[in-house]
Amino acid sequence: VTRDDQLTAGLARVALGQFPTALEVAPRLSAEPGFPPVWVKREDLSGLALGGNKPRQLEFLMAAAMAEGAQAVITTAAAQSNFCRATAAAGARLGIRVGLLLRGTGQEALQGNLLLDRLLGADVRFIPTLDPYDTRVPGWIDDMVADYTRQGLKTHVLHLPGRTGMLGAAAMVCTGEEMARQFAAQGIQPQAVFLAAGSGLTVAGLALAFKTLGLPTRVVGISVQKQADFMVPLIVERA
């Protein structure tokens, strides 16, 4: 796929999302007393099973898997993971089997993302932990890879950190470059960008892009899992 991004031009991508997504002003919120102008990056319009910013990462991650000749990919996250749902959708589109190791008991209600995972054809299995940093997770991934290997499937693993983290952050560098073009087109220079921070990849990628492009815009991540003293070094490492 060819896009306008220059900072990651040497990395392979496969088209999965509808980009660029719009940057829209929120007129009523911006009109509130004491409020500066507020703009919203419409990642809800990215396509691919309402995947938000996940298709951006998957364009790079699935391209890497395809370059290796992968017939299957495996990833792991919470039972209602948006990333897992988007990965299942990407696999369905590209004809690649998707194995999901979801944290939980297996007794979770079949609704939301879990239902969509199954409708999209993913191989859903559960692992007995709720902690994304559980040291047993790599072993469970290895077990699933071994199972797929016995079935004759060449398998690629999507799991932080390592190459998955590097490519995921690179995808968000592209987002930062896309936003910089939109700032220029709108004639604005935002003081800060606020976003949720889970893995830290989006914060890392945006901050790296803005710094590289010489933008003064701060990137403020609101952690959804861990405290700041855990997240900050993680984000720095992934940048």
Regions found by a protein language model. Give the residues of each.
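PLP-dependent amino-acid enzyme catalytic core
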Residues: 1-239
